[in-house]
Amino acid sequence: NEPMDHAYVPTTGHFLGLASLTVDPSRVGALIESAHTILAGLDPSDEMAYALYHKKLWSVHLNDQNGLKFDEDKSFGVVDLRRAFNQVWVLERNGYGQNGEFIGLDVKALRTQSKETSTKHLRNSRAIFLRLVDLCRTLDVAKVEDLRAARDYEELDLMIVNHLLGS
């Protein structure tokens, strides 16, 4: 599996700072993988938002991760649904994909499987992603902004969790 004990440029901010010093910074962008961000102890949606703000998010690889162990490449959204929602929310709210960017699914089968079930991790990741896109599009954005303005983050969290639960 991919080594995780050497991070020369540990965050998107560090990377973009270093990239700005190159001969042609316009040729440099970020590909953010959810699991690698989680392995670094960071939040993928924060890293994506930072790169988007700087117009440097060129691609994402969505997957999930249990925590600080090896790179698991689990199906997107199966470990932390709220974290997955936050990633989709950031991408959707910023129109990601409308200018030629693409979203990849960097996932793998959990164990040796039969041929018939060997691609279910891709199907599951895609289904979860598309369902989260629908949920992002149906969340009451005005209420989200009202709660942010009121700094009522507990109510905002509950509202989003209830939306994810379908209530």
Map each language-model feature to its residues.
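Histidine-acidic metal/acid-base catalytic patches
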Residues: 5-167
